[in-house]
Every structure is written in C-alpha cells, then in structure tokens.
C-alpha cells in the first residue's frame, strides 16, 4: 500500500476551505444530512419542481457535496470532505441530458452559481451536447467571471469517442479517475481534454436515502469532487489568486503516473491530483499569468448524449447508516499517498470506511470518518 499521511496535519492546518462557496450542479443536495448540516446554502432548482436545490431524490449530489465539504458527526463518525469548511450551493438540474430542458437547466445553473458568488463549480455530470451554444456561453461566462469549473470526463471508458461535455468545454478542468494504485480506472473516459485524474474507486460518501445514509461508488464523479475541494482549499488559502492560477497550481503540482507514463496524456492529463503540493508556495504560478490555461484548449469530438440517460451514472451501493464498528486508530482522516520525485501522490483520505465494496455490490455501514481511499449525467 502507498505510504500514508494525516490529512489533519498536512491539509487542514493549512486550509479547510473557509469562506469559499462551491456550487454543486447535480441532483440537489440534502441539507439535513448529518454530515452536511449547516454547510448547505439555499440554491436553485432548474428541473421545474420549484425547490431551492436542497431536495435530492437521487442521492448523487448529496454524495458529491459530502466529499467536498462534509464535516462528519458525533465522535469522529461519518464523511469528512477535503474542504470541510467550504459552503455548498446546490444547483439542481435534470439528470436526463438528452432533454432540452436539462440542457437549458445546465446553462442556467452555471450562470446562477456564478451570480450567487460560487468560486468553484462542481459538475459531476456528463453526456451533454457540445453544440449547445447556451451552455457554451454559460461556461465562458463563468470563466470570464473568475470561477473554477470542474467536470467529470465520463464513465464509458474506451467506448466513448472522447471526454464528455461539459468537461470538454474550453476552460473546464476535465477529471478522470484512478484506482488505489494510481492506475487509470477501467471505465474512466479519456481524451486530449483530460486535465487531471483523482481517486474514483471504492469511494465512501453520503447518500440522500436518509439523513444518516451512506453509500460506496466508483466513478469520475467522485474524482471531480476531490478536484473541486482542492480548488476550494487553494482559493481559501490564496484568495488573491485568479481562477486560472488556481487551475495552474493543481496542474503544476500534479504527481506523475506511478507507471512512468509521460504527461500530459489522454489518460492522465497532467497527472494525479496532489492537494498538499497544490497548497505549497509556488511563486512561479502565483506571479504568472492570471488567464485560465485551459481556455484555448482544442476540442476533439465530444461524447454525444447517450440513448440511456443512466450511462455514466456511478452506481451507488447504499448503506443504511454509520453506526457500525470502527476502523481502529483515532479515526481521523488519513491520506494514502506516495512520494514520487518529491511530490506527494494523494490517493485520498481514508478514515474508518462506512462500507467497503466494489461498485455493483451491496455494503454494510461502518463507523468513523469515511473520507474515501483517494478521495452524467451523474458520473
């Protein structure tokens, strides 16, 4: 196993995401989940149901929010996000991307997030059309307003032509998934737009099945949440940096692949997300260009909306609660990583697992912070 380090000693004393609003454009976020209580702001609902975004009938958005800003509960139980003091702005959109209402909802959701002060926008969704000008202009609006946009590459693996939209839009950080060993997850969609990869296998997260619900999943959705959380950590610690400089920090600090593959590449992008390195002093980036380095990125043929809107959706194994046995130790978050060329390869923060199972299997809830082992529509 890769060498580990304590998140509470390397990440959280430096930054916890204080003062940063992260918009989660997804299925909504359950504001009453015990690990998110007090973290979720009133948002918006673009599905036509008239909520404020704090309704989540699927559970996916709640899971993403927990990986970003979960604070656990009780005696070190539940899910801790990488940025536990960031605030979540829920933006509920339809999860049927072939629907024109859904396409329009994404565009409106992005603009809403920007206008409500989000500094980071997490889009763990995919399968949208790259030809939709309303969404394209909304992405540009966010980039022009100094917002970090992060989206999942897709969960179709080699079956997809390339990275899905909205991740493939210029200016968006497109995120793929790696497993515990830092190897590409077999279903992670890849292409020239891939920017970074992050942990996305056997990820424990909150679920909206109940206020004490949890689940386990594989997917680029989870990887995307970790990148968004890291962006929040950077924005909290370095508030004067532009969104482009935040993106550049994550790119420049990424760890090379464990298999020695050259980067940038279609599978790894610029490498594996390394939050601790991204928070270190980096004058060459901080004093460099403020423009988004991805704004001029070439677009290959994006993956079209699938006939089955559930394609690419991470299948969550749901656990009923988090009241089972602990994982030993003090239960605080441990980040599993490896030192490569002086850089820490962050594979994630694991504390006691809420459940441990491969995707597509059922799990049982456990106790202790469930920060996963590395950390579209719904991916």
Question: Can you annotate each of these PLM segments?
Answer:
Residues 152-171, 176-193, 205-218, 259-268:
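Active-site-adjacent substrate-recognition loops and nearby beta-strands
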Residues 317-379:
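Hydrophobic single-pass membrane-targeting/anchoring helices
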Residues 65-68, 201-268:
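Hydrolase catalytic cores
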Residues 12-22, 29-42, 52-102, 190-193, ...:
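Subtilisin-like serine protease catalytic core
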Residues 186, 240-335, 372-377:
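C-terminal subdomain of the subtilisin-like protease fold in secreted/lumenal serine endopeptidases
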Residues 18-21, 85-87, 115-121, 144-149, ...:
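Loop/turn elements at helix/coil->beta-strand transitions in domains of secreted/extracellular proteins
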Residues 27-31, 46-48, 72-74, 94-98, ...:
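Solvent-exposed loop/turn segments at secondary-structure junctions
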Residues 93-165, 212-218, 222:
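Substrate-binding/access-modulating region of protease and related hydrolase catalytic domains
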């Amino acid at each position: 196993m890769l060498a580990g380090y304590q998140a509470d000693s390397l990440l959280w004393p430096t930054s916890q995401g204080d003062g940063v609003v992260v918009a989660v454009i997804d299925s909504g976020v359950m504001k009453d989940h015990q690990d998110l209580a007090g973290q979720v702001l009133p948002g918006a609902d673009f599905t036509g149901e008239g909520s404020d975004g704090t309704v989540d009938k699927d559970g996916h958005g709640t899971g993403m929010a927990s990986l970003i800003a979960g604070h656990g509960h009780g005696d070190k139980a539940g899910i801790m996000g990488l940025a536990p003091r960031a605030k979540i702005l829920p933006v509920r959109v339809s999860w049927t991307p072939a629907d024109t209402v859904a396409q329009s909802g994404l565009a409106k959701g992005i603009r809403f997030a920007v206008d409500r002060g989000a500094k980071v926008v997490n889009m763990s969704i995919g399968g949208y059309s790259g030809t939709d000008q309303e969404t394209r202009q909304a992405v540009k609006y966010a980039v022009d307003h100094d917002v970090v946009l992060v989206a999942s590459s897709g969960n179709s693996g080699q079956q997809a032509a390339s990275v899905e939209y909205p991740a493939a839009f210029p200016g968006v950080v497109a995120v793929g998934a790696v497993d515990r060993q830092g190897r590409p997850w077999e279903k992670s969609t890849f292409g020239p737009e891939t920017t970074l990869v992050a942990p996305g296998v056997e990820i424990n997260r909150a679920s909206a099945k109940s206020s004490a619900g949890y689940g386990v999943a594989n997917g680029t959705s989870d990887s995307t949440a970790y990148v968004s959380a890291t962006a929040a950590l950077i924005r909290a610690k370095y508030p004067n940096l532009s969104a482009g400089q935040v993106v550049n920090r994550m790119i420049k600090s990424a760890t090379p692949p464990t298999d020695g593959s050259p980067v940038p590449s279609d599978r790894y992008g610029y490498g594996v997300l390394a939050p601790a390195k991204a928070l270190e002093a980096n004058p060459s980036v901080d004093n460099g260009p403020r423009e988004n380095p991805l704004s001029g990125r070439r677009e290959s043929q994006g993956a079209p909306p699938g006939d089955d809107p559930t394609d690419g959706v991470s299948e969550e194994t749901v656990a009923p609660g988090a009241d089972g046995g602990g994982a030993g130790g003090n239960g605080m978050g441990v980040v599993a990583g490896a030192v490569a060329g002086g850089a820490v390869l962050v594979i994630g923060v694991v504390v006691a697992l809420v459940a441990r199972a491969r995707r597509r299997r059922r799990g049982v809830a456990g106790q202790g912070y469930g920060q996963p082992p590395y950390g579209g529509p719904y991916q």
